[in-house]
């Protein structure tokens, strides 16, 4: 090969190598003076605002942990509400050379294939938001969970709802001494939905709120589905609905949208409570369209996952005091209502701007 052809070949090889580095996601390589941590993040869907916000915050936290000796590459994929598809995406991440996997399961009862694939390649897994069954998480010492205690969120939601109802007699519109309510439930068989539903209602009753159930409706954590369910309930019950309890803010916002479109004046609306502390829900609380939410602290969870990913990669010891049974990290929920909405809304706006 003459020198000109050899030079072209070398340049072409370098160009291809650079392209591979840029496009390879988990498989990207760094120079020899720095280590590269490759983190694969696989969510159950790409249509959940809370999960999207948590993923963005995780990427920001990992970016902040880069230094001269450590580069961090984050690749994200969605399971699109299909466990089989999520399994395939996990396999792709493993084949691409990821060092740590952060997985938000489609089906919390079906992580076996993911665990088997990760264990075969000795890749630690941090499950988040959707807690696997305990027996599955205990299969291997490199499996972890980061999230919140769903029971706590249900209790807190019941507490802020009871406090509001007990101090606002106008909630009982028909003055029958009972609060007629509907409940928007996230997903059939989902542990968080079950716990939030059970403990929110129990806590209301424990705090001397006499309830009359009009309807429970499954809406799959989805705003559009919740709006459709509420449209039917409004047609059926009209102004009889005095309270809407929702397993998450997205569905609560669906209820808000239904009442906006129904033509009711604000005084005719029921009181509405959600869970997650989404910025749009906090704005609805500020506007008086919702009466409260329970903040699911995505920043705290993202910080913990990022720290764990780096520690696993570096082979460092965990702070065992922060992990229950050496496997679980639960961040604390926080109550948000009219009394502290400005504090949390300002904090949420700051977080949102930092993620841009």
What spans do the regions from the language model cover?
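Hydrophobic alpha-helical segments within soluble ligand-binding/sensing domains
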Residues: 86, 145-176, 226-227, 277-281, ...
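Short, solvent-exposed amphipathic alpha-helices that sit
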Residues: 50-66, 153-157, 191-210, 225, ...
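Flexible loop/hinge segments that line or gate small-molecule binding clefts
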Residues: 114-152, 176-177, 278-286, 291
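Short beta-strand elements in bilobed, periplasmic/extracellular small-molecule ligand-binding domains
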Residues: 64-79, 183, 205-220
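Hydrophobic alpha-helical
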Residues: 58, 103-120, 125, 200, ...
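Extracytoplasmic "Venus flytrap"
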Residues: 40-61, 65, 75-88, 98, ...
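Hinge/cleft segment of the Venus flytrap/periplasmic-binding protein
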Residues: 35, 46, 177-188, 192, ...
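Short, low-complexity disordered leader/linker segments with a strong preference
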Residues: 1-38, 94, 116-123, 352-356
């Amino acid at each position: 090969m003459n020198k000109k052809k050899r030079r072209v070949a070398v340049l072409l090889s370098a160009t291809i190598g650079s392209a591979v580095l840029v496009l390879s996601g988990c498989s990207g390589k760094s120079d020899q003076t720095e280590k590269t941590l490759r983190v694969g993040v696989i969510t159950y869907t790409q249509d959940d605002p809370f999960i999207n916000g948590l993923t963005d915050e995780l990427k920001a936290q990992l970016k902040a942990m880069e230094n001269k000796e450590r580069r961090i590459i984050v690749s994200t994929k969605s399971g699109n509400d299909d466990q089989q598809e999520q399994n395939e995406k996990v396999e792709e991440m493993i084949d691409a050379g990821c060092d740590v996997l952060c997985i938000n399961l489609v089906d919390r009862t079906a992580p076996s294939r993911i665990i088997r694939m990760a264990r075969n390649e000795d890749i630690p897994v941090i499950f988040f938001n959707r807690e696997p069954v305990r027996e599955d998480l205990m299969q291997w010492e490199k499996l972890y969970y980061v999230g919140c205690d769903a029971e706590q969120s249900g209790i807190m939601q019941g507490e802020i709802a009871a406090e509001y109802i007990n101090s606002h007699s106008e909630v009982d519109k028909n003055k029958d001494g009972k609060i007629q309510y509907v409940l928007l439930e996230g997903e059939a068989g989902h542990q968080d939905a079950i716990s939030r539903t059970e403990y929110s209602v129990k806590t209301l009753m424990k705090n001397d709120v006499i309830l009359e159930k009009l309807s429970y409706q499954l809406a799959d954590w989805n705003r559009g589905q919740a709006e459709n369910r509420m449209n039917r309930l409004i047609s059926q019950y009209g102004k009889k609905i005095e309270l809407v309890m929702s397993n998450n803010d997205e569905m609560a916002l669906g209820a808000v949208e239904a009442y906006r479109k129904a033509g009711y004046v604000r005084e005719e609306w029921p009181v509405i409570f959600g869970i997650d502390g989404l910025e749009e829900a906090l704005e609805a609380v500020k506007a008086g369209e919702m009466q409260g939410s329970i903040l699911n602290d995505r920043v705290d969870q993202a910080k913990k996952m990022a720290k764990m990913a780096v520690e696993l990669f570096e082979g460092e010891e965990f702070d065992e005091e922060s992990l229950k049974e050496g496997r679980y990290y639960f961040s604390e929920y926080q109550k948000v209502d009219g009394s502290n909405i400005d504090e949390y809304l300002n904090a949420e706006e700051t977080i949102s701007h930092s993620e841009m």
